[in-house]
């Protein structure tokens, strides 16, 4: 039987409804999209959990209680596989705005590295590092009508507002909620704290923070703690991803695909046995089964993959491609199961079974 004849017969079977292509298409599309979507939703949930932690500075650690070398602290950000950002701080003199003589505002002196950390932590994404003036929290800016580039008159003189940072109440250290931050040189004396931000978390961070200590005080030893204590300190993003419940969805999809492939052939086994009795070769029959299955199974898998692409691009906040790669394994496994099961089921059909199939029809 020529290739053109096999292809035309397969297309006629699909067009006439003999192959039940529409039903099988919908079954593959539904199974692939639901299982793949479940996997995508699970990975996106883990992604959002990680994003929430990063936004809330749950990935930031601080060392306090002793003298800190500001220069060493700022340079932690340049260490290979070390913190992405690091900066030092110390409490400064209270500042009294000229407009409210009886109201002091706590101020902190910070190194340039701390400014980078504050700018990166801003959820709006509009904050830019600038050490040319003071930084004020959004609450202070709201109460005094301050804006970036504008003046702020205090009992220590008039300063330019270089930045306004947001400091939400999400479990993080509350000292910056209502504060003025004054940039100083990292070599300007010692500091009382060093903050380091590293994602994913590493045991190396604590060791690096201790390296910033100038001189330890036996009565007040240095201690390392999280900037945001509202999150689990033992959180492991990689372990959460590897142990997610939906990691088995490709296997479930493979099982569904095998079932659909078997059903698609067994429901037509009398037809296939009759074709063999009429002189059709086994090779031509298997090729016809492969073409029909490829058409309805492949098109359904492609359509499901398209839906998953749209979902991942729309819902993923940071890395849609990584989510998509995880999700597409499911429709791929489903399609592989359909093709393999259909071909193997076709191999089991023989001409000698015609009478038995007809008898049990």
Predicted regions and their residues:
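Alpha-helical transmembrane segments
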Residues: 11, 20, 30-58, 70, ...
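C-terminal membrane-exit region of the final transmembrane helix in multipass inner-membrane proteins
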Residues: 333-361
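Membrane-proximal extracellular/periplasmic loop immediately following the first transmembrane helix
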Residues: 1, 43-112
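Basic-flanked hydrophobic alpha-helices used for secretion and membrane insertion
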Residues: 76-83, 90-233
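Peri-transmembrane interface segments
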Residues: 215-253, 263-264
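Transmembrane alpha-helical interface segments in multi-pass membrane proteins
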Residues: 274-342
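A short amphipathic helical element positioned immediately N-terminal to and/or at the very start
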Residues: 3-18
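A hydrophobic alpha-helix feature that marks transmembrane segments and, especially
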Residues: 39-40, 250-273, 285, 290
